[in-house]
Amino acid sequence: MLYQSKTISLKNGTEAYFRSPLASDASEMMDFLKTCAFETPFILRYPEECIETAEQESNYLEGINKSETGIMLVCVIDGKIAGNCQVMFQSRIKTKHRASVAIGLLQRYWQLGIGTAMFREMIAIAKNMGVLQLELDYIEGNVRAKSLYEKMGF
């Protein structure tokens, strides 16, 4: 599923661009994911587990963009990926009202309002798809994430 791009202003006045990831983002996306995993223990994998090739990541990004059950957006600042988030929808009749969300943001971009803005986008997308219940994984001790989740109504 593709995301309709938009530009937002951050707390520090910088502009951030939200868009669907491109297949050509694959190498940068792998670097981004590895850096996120290195910067915080709250990402669900270790840096050494980020072993996908650029081709595998490119195929994944193309797949998510064509998917009817998922959407990803990246936050680009000054031409570089600063964050990403994803909504994965359920396809079974019994659970179609549910979706899971995930978010990642490089440490140097924390406290600029990006996480809040990405969450607002994910919530709007989910509501538009008829989702009534959003779910996420919370890792004990992740105080920053807990604060964001509570602020967003989780």
Region locations from a protein language model:
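Helix-loop element at the rim of GNAT/NAT acetyltransferase active sites that forms part
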Residues: S20, D31-E48
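Acetyl-CoA-dependent GNAT
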Residues: A37, E49-H97, A102-L106, F119-R120
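Active-site acidic-Proline motif in GNAT/NAT acetyltransferases
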Residues: I103-R108, L112, E140-G141
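Conserved acetyl-CoA pyrophosphate-binding loop and the N-cap/start of the following alpha-helix
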Residues: Y109, G113-E121
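Conserved GNAT acetyl-CoA-binding A-motif
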Residues: F119, A126-D137
